[in-house]
């Protein structure tokens, strides 16, 4: 992953006046992973999700970084998110697959789907993988970088609720 700006992450601290505290990315990752483990996520999965959140912040995608931690922790605590999903391939061909996320954390399902896609692309030349029954996906660029690290072109995308009108639109 990216080392960011000297491996440090600015973290907003909410007080009467907005301030920022800068911490080492490694410290932040360890803290986030600890919180996720405390909510029932297995250690290796907690480490991966924490790394994906901190990486988003290091890349400037703060909307999908550590800002997401309260939601992720709450959804684990309230059993909205499955902390130990049995992620699996539902159906597949030489260059495609459908993955069932079993209600697991989006970063875990996204990683699995991209790993399947990478393996198929290396074998078939290109591949498409879809996933269902997954929670919040996180930063899509994180998964595309997994493909880039293997000298592949990766695209990652997800569905979302409409949140703003298209240019010239009212709804």
Spans of features found by a protein language model:
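Glycine-rich anion/phosphate-binding loop at the beta-strand->alpha-helix junction
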Residues: 126-171
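Conserved catalytic cysteine-centered active-site region
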Residues: 116-129
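Active-site cofactor/substrate anionic-group-binding motifs, chiefly glycine-
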Residues: 65-118
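Helix N-cap / loop-to-helix initiation motif
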Residues: 41-46
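Generic N-terminal amphipathic, Lys/Arg-enriched alpha-helix
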Residues: 18-39
């Amino acid at each position: 992953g990216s080392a960011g700006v000297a491996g440090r992450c600015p973290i907003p601290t909410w007080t009467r006046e907005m301030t920022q505290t800068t911490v080492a990315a490694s410290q932040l990752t360890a803290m986030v992973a600890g919180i996720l483990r405390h909510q029932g996520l297995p250690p290796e999965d907690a480490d991966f999700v924490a790394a994906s959140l901190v990486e988003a912040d290091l890349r400037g995608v703060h909307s999908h970084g550590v800002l997401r931690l309260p939601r992720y922790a709450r959804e684990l605590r309230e059993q909205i998110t499955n902390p130990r999903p049995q992620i699996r391939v539902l159906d597949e061909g030489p260059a495609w697959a459908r993955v069932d996320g079993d209600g697991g954390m989006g970063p875990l399902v996204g990683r699995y789907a991209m790993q399947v896609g990478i393996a198929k692309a290396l074998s078939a030349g290109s591949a498409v993988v879809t996933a269902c029954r997954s929670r919040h996906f996180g930063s899509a660029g994180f998964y595309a970088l997994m493909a880039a690290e293997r000298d592949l072109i990766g695209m990652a995308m997800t569905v979302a609720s409409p949140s703003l009108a298209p240019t010239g639109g009212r709804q």
